Amino acid sequence: MVMTVRVIAPDKTVWDAPAEEVILPSTTGQLGILSNHAPLLTALETGVMRVRQDREWVAIALMGGFAEVENNEVTILVNGAERGDTIDLEKAKAEFAAAQAALAQAEQGESKQAKIQATQAFRRARARLQAAGGVVEI
């Protein structure tokens, strides 16, 4: 049995297709959704969502948001999203390295705002790299 999964960002619909399973980066950890799941509303962290369709997994980088599960429909509203197969792996690696360096520098300073911004940029870069298939070592 399948469910309908939609990933909607402010600028586009990133995914709108049936799926057999979804794994979401919720604020309490990874959350697996199968068909006939109980109704649910949850907040999502910046991270990688995985969708299983026809025995193949598709990775999508999510930039935080919310997910609603009801009647075999999973609706995901996010601040931004990008399919892993559209992300340039080398560019994602470079962005991750730059974000990692910026975070290390921000942690040495005293500005809380700079630390928060660097942490958010790091999480976005990490999600994009993971979705593109890159290995992340922290």
UniProtKB/Swiss-Prot annotation:
Its subunit composition reads: F-type ATPases have 2 components, CF(1) - the catalytic core - and CF(0) - the membrane proton channel. CF(1) has five subunits: alpha(3), beta(3), gamma(1), delta(1), epsilon(1). CF(0) has four main subunits: a(1), b(1), b'(1) and c(9-12).
User: Which SUPFAM superfamilies does this UniProt record tie to the protein?
Assistant: Epsilon subunit of F1F0-ATP synthase N-terminal domain
The record describes its membrane topology as:
Peripheral membrane protein
Q: Which domain of life is it from?
A: Bacteria
Q: Which family would the database say this protein is a member of?
A: Belongs to the ATPase epsilon chain family.
Keyword annotations of the record = ATP synthesis, CF(1), Hydrogen ion transport, Ion transport, Membrane, Thylakoid, Transport
Q: Give the organism, scientific name.
A: Thermosynechococcus vestitus (strain NIES-2133 / IAM M-273 / BP-1)
> Which Pfam families does this chain map to?
ATP-synt_DE, ATP-synt_DE_N
The identity of this protein, by name, is ATP synthase epsilon chain
The protein's job, in short, is: Produces ATP from ADP in the presence of a proton gradient across the membrane. The complex from the organism is particularly stable to disruption and remains functional after 6 hours at 55 degrees Celsius.
> Where is it localised?
Cellular thylakoid membrane
Lineage of the organism: Bacteria, Bacillati, Cyanobacteriota, Cyanophyceae, Acaryochloridales
User: Which residues are connected by disulfide bridges in this protein?
Assistant: none
Q: Does the keyword Thylakoid apply?
A: yes
Please provide, in alphabetical order, the Gene Ontology terms of the cellular component aspect for this entry.
plasma membrane-derived thylakoid membrane; proton-transporting ATP synthase complex
Q: Which residues form a coiled coil?
A: none
Q: Which GO terms describe its molecular function?
A: ATP binding; proton-transporting ATP synthase activity, rotational mechanism
